[in-house]
């Protein structure tokens, strides 16, 4: 029963109780005065469901309410910050937050129990009685959005904030500057937007090395930004702005060329019209630092976030290596190379942010030339960078491209592109199940390191997301998997259960008109006909033993260790063969990797299930031969130890 409630993330502890609570237009909210903002948000949602005004009364008014939702606070609850307790009982719903954010999280749980479509068809809805005690595993539950490559209306961002809140995500990492566009109004430097917010062309879908020749651009005014920050704050979401430096800065340098490496041959900065990594980086001049500090001063005035993201990724060193001025700075500062100049650059910015009582976050390249002490590293490439930061005592946010880049395909590329060029993605493959399977704490070797992992974040890089519909397509439903791995400890995760709940949650997306994708379901771990297959080997990743006999050519079994003599794979057929048949077993992966094929082994059959008769030896990773009618079982027997692992493709019996 608990499994069927469409809650994502799943609460940490949920117990079903007897009975139910009936919510209707007569239900009123009784609230602690510190929760007036949260109460208004809940009341608004209930009004949309019932079509009638919801009554809210402050807690101290002892008015008798026949049907109530009570919102309360209790800092003594033995929960992490952001935790809450909730009961649904026939007399009412009670949500008690450890803090205000916790009460808000509890409200989201309640909203997920209500009907997806508004207004309700019936005048009331019955909620199952239950008790929940819930708290987040991670404090940083983030979603990133690149508004540099493409620009989206602020109204869409507000809706996105709502949807993040619905899933208890709490950090919106707003990527505001790029080679292809500067999107934040800076009063002191108006050309950043007058020039930097517009480009002359964009690659069309389907041809990334081409140009559409259309002028494109836009930016957010400071007034709009303040409104979004306040909107997010009311929903317990912190907006972490990102101002890219020293690289991904071509648009800013095009607007103010004096802050680039002006002394290099062919210097001619432009707002970029193609994707990829571009050479324009800021010059290490005192005027440039003043310029960046002025920008960051306005940024800090707009964004109350403790963390300010300064990019730091993909800053080519070619211009610094060409620039006489940059080389003089390296000499003056005793820097060995351009990597150390990058680190010098980052450290100066870190110091400036510290003077404003802010903390620097940067992509994992901020370790080039030495990681600044108090910096938080956002790990996007190899997990070894996380290890490196943890060793140095720095905090990390896990945002690895292999598991958390939502610009990757979520269904097979051929299938997507057959629907139209607008389904193009940058590349990669991240089905919802793969994201769900990611453990943000996988790099932690002990409890101390676990605590240095602040959380996990999904990335939406938008080269291939020209409009908001495409952003939705890439974000949903994968955002649900992200939310669950950010909220639930690893031992509480369960993909099959999540997948059932996701069907319920997708009804909310559909009711809101979100242009979601259809999740790609991983192949079921079942044999094709109910035959039983087992092995003495262990399974690597998701490559279940059943995949060796599931009727699908694109799945396979993969054993995740070296082989010992007498290791086996045994297939017991659902019913004995009625005629002579030919069996074939093909093992091995790509030849270039030497195989993972079976070097020494026998293919055997049995008619009584216990006496085994050899059909053939494996040769070049393959065995085949004829087996008699009445055969009940097949076995692959390893006859000598081997160093390589083992891949077994579909076993065929014809
Ligand atoms: C990145 O994807 N360049 C952080």
Please describe what each predicted stretch is.
Residues 3-140, 470, 485-519:
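Contiguous, structured surface segment used for ligand recognition
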Residues 75-307, 348, 352, 452, ...:
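Feature activates predominantly on carbohydrate-active enzymes
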Residues 257, 271-273, 277-373, 380-388:
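Active-site neighborhood of glycoside hydrolase catalytic domains
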Residues 359-375, 381-528:
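Flexible, acidic glycine-rich loops studded with aromatic residues
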Residues 520-579, 586-601, 617-618, 650-654:
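Disordered, acidic Ser/Thr/Pro-rich linker "stalks" and the adjacent N-terminal cap
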Residues 571, 622-628:
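Exposed aromatic-hydrophobic patches
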Residues 636-644:
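Short beta-strand-plus-loop segments that form exposed binding edges in beta-rich domains
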């Amino acid at each position: 029963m608990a499994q069927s409630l469409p809650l994502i993330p799943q609460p940490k502890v949920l117990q079903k109780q007897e009975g139910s609570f009936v919510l209707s237009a007569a239900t009123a909210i009784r609230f602690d005065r510190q929760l007036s903002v949260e109460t208004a948000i809940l009341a608004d949602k209930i009004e949309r469901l019932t079509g009638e005004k919801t009554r809210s009364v402050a807690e101290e008014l002892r008015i008798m309410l026949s049907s109530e939702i009570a919102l309360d606070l209790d800092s003594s609850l033995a929960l992490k910050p952001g935790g809450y307790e909730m009961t649904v009982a026939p007399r009412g719903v009670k949500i008690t937050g450890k803090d205000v954010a916790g009460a808000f999280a509890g409200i989201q749980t309640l909203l997920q129990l209500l009907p997806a479509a508004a207004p309700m068809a019936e005048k009331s809805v019955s909620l199952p009685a239950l008790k929940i005690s819930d708290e987040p595993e991670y404090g940083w539950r983030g979603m990133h959005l690149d508004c540099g490559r493409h620009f989206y209306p602020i109204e869409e961002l507000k809706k996105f904030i709502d949807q993040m809140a619905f899933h208890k995500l709490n950090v919106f990492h707003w990527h505001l500057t790029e080679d292809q566009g500067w999107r934040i109004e800076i009063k002191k430097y108006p050309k950043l937007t007058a020039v930097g917010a517009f480009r002359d062309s964009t690659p069309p879908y389907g041809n990334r090395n081409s140009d559409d020749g259309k002028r494109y651009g836009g930016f957010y005014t400071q007034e709009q930004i303040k409104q979004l920050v306040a909107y997010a704050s009311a929903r317990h979401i912190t907006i972490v702005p990102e101002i890219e430096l020293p690289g991904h800065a071509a648009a800013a340098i095009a607007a103010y060329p004096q802050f680039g490496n002006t002394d290099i041959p062919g210097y001619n900065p432009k707002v970029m019209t193609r994707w990829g990594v571009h050479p324009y980086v800021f010059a290490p001049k005192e005027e440039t630092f003043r310029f960046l500090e002025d920008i960051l001063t306005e940024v800090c005035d707009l964004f109350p976030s403790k963390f300010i993201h300064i990019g730091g990724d993909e800053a080519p060193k070619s211009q610094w290596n060409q620039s006489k001025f940059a080389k003089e700075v390296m000499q003056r500062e005793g820097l060995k190379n351009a990597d150390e100049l990058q680190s010098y650059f980052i450290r100066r910015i870190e110091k400036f942010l510290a003077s404003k009582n802010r903390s620097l976050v940067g992509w994992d390249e901020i370790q080039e030339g030495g990681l600044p002490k108090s910096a938080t590293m956002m790990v996007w490439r190899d997990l070894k960078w996380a290890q490196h930061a943890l060793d140095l005592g720095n905090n990390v946010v896990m945002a690895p491209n292999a598991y958390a880049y939502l610009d990757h395909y979520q269904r097979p590329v051929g299938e997507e592109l057959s629907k139209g060029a607008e389904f193009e993605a940058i590349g990669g493959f991240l089905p919802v199940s793969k994201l769900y399977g990611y453990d943000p704490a996988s790099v932690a070797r002990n409890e101390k390191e676990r605590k240095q992992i602040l959380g996990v974040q999904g990335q939406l890089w938008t080269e291939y997301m020209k409009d908001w519909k495409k952003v939705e397509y890439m974000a949903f439903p994968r955002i649900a998997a992200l939310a669950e791995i950010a909220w639930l400890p690893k031992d509480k995760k369960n993909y099959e259960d999540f997948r059932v709940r996701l069907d319920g949650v997708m009804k909310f997306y559909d009711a809101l008109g979100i242009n979601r994708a259809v999740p790609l379901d991983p192949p079921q771990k079942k044999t094709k006909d109910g035959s039983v297959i087992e092995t003495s080997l262990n399974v690597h990743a998701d490559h279940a033993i059943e995949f060796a006999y599931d009727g699908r050519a694109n799945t396979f079994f993969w054993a995740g260790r070296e082989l010992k003599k007498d290791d086996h794979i045994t297939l017991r057929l659902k019913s004995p063969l009625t005629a002579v048949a030919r069996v074939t077993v093909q093992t091995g992966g790509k030849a270039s990797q030497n195989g993972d094929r079976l070097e020494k082994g026998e293919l055997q059959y049995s008619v009584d299930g216990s006496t085994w008769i050899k059909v053939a030896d494996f040769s070049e990773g393959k065995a085949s031969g004829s087996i008699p009618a009445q055969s009940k079982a097949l076995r692959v027997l390893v006859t000598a130890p081997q160093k390589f692992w083992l891949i077994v493709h579909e076993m065929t019996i014809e």
